[in-house]
Amino acid sequence: MPSIAVRTFTDPVEYFAGIRNLQIDGFVVGRGEFCAKSTRIDLHRLWMHRFDEDLPRIMKVTPSGTRAGILFALRRAQPAMQVNGIETSQNQIAKFGLNRDWYHRSLASCEWGTMSLTREDFAAVGEAMFGHELVSSSFTGSVAPPATALSRLRNLHEAAGHLAKTVPDILARPEVARAIEQGLVEAMMFCLADSPFEDMRNVQRHRARIMRRLEATLAANSEQPLYMADLAAQVGASYWTLRDCCLEYLGMSPRRYLWLRRMHLAQRALRRADAERTTVTEIAADYGFWELGRFSVAYRSLFGESPSTALRRAPDAPRT
């Protein structure tokens, strides 16, 4: 039975958690109040999403291990996104496999979409249409489809999103859903078939291993701040190696990445804390910010409100 969900998010943590089939660890890197819209459409075999985000962000993506698919820009004139440090322009799509983590970075506000099938369905459709499988289990890479194929994919994806928002009852009808699904799957396959691609499997294997160790270290210290000396020691790499890896995959130095991580940890702590029992100064110090004035200015610039306002609000209460 087809299902549809259209949602708006102001909390990036909830937004990342709401992207189904992918485990996402990420945070916003732009300044201001976050807002994102998500349209999810589950057809018979095909799952698709449409996303509209107003601030740049970095996401480390862990696939579910059951579905492979593609992502692409929905707007023809928007800044390029990056997948594993490789630019994916509005004339390309990125395809991702079943079991390899990858990074997705936006440089500004963006609209992007995804489509996915199970490995078995992907293999069956690829064999039926072209005689071979089109997405491997570990592959993540950029593809440059023919302009006509990509245009058709975008148009069908947009039409499905429009139906989901305006007349969802029609899209939920099995015969309509099946027809749209067939058109979308066919369009996706023609984008993937025989398209030149930039293969990331054999590029920078050493840096990919460093990034996996970096993320494992961050995961092991998910609720506490890390500093450069500790990070380099636990990852087993020099600062310069970490810097090169982070610049390629994340678009920023490891020092900046750790600073942003500490800021987001402090934001989470402020939102969860009881203002009667703790202070902004205590929370800031817990996460390595000892100059309260500088912290307050940076916090307001990054999140659009003062840390004292975040603390006074009841836990999990929405912003007004």
Task: Give the location of each predicted region.
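Well-ordered mid-protein domain cores that form the structural environment of catalytic cofactors
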Residues: 47-49, 55-102
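C-terminal structural cap/anchor segments
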Residues: 237, 247, 256-259
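Alpha-helical bundle regulatory/interaction domains
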Residues: 1-33, 79-222, 227-229, 233-239, ...
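Short hydrophobic/aromatic patch on the recognition helix
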Residues: 242, 246, 294-295, 299
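Generic hydrophobic, amphipathic alpha-helix propensity
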Residues: 210-214, 258-263
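Conserved glycine-rich phosphate/nucleotide-binding loop
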Residues: 285, 297, 303
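Short, conserved glycine- and acidic-residue-centered signature motifs
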Residues: 63, 207, 259
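N-terminal low-complexity or simple alpha-helical regulatory segments
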Residues: 1-66, 70-72
